[in-house]
Design a protein with these regions (language model features):
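C-terminal binding/interaction regions
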Residues: 1-17, 65-86
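Generic N-terminal targeting/processing segments that precede catalytic cores or assembly contacts
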Residues: 1-3, 18, 22-24, 29
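Residue-level detector of functional hotspots within protein domains
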Residues: 6-8, 20, 38, 45
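Short alpha-helical scaffold segments that flank and stabilize functional sites
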Residues: 19-20, 57, 61, 81
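Amphipathic, hydrophobic secondary-structure cores in small proteins
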Residues: 25-27, 31-62
């Protein structure tokens, strides 16, 4: 992606994380996999479902799930679902 857009995204996410009392560094290792997942879902099974899927990953992670494994599982499910788009 465009480096300027990515810098703005990171600036925003730092603000957002602080607003909800989350250490912004939690995104370091999962940023690109989450962005990839959202892209696959938004261009595949459901555009409006993409951000909500990311929310579900966050909830599952908070319940003890492994973020990267969850992302991988959901990307596989989205790819199996095909290219039908809402």
């Amino acid at each position: 992606d465009n480096p300027e857009k990515m810098a703005r995204m990171r600036d925003w996410l730092e603000i957002a994380a602080r607003e909800v009392d989350v250490d912004p560094s939690v995104l370091t290792d999962v940023e690109q996999p989450l962005l990839d997942m959202v892209s696959v879902i938004s261009h595949g099974p459901s555009r409006p479902g993409a951000p909500l899927t990311a929310f579900l990953v966050g909830i599952a992670t908070a319940q003890g799930g492994d973020t990267l494994q969850l992302v991988k599982k959901l990307m596989q499910a989205a790819e199996q679902r095909g290219q039908t788009r809402d």
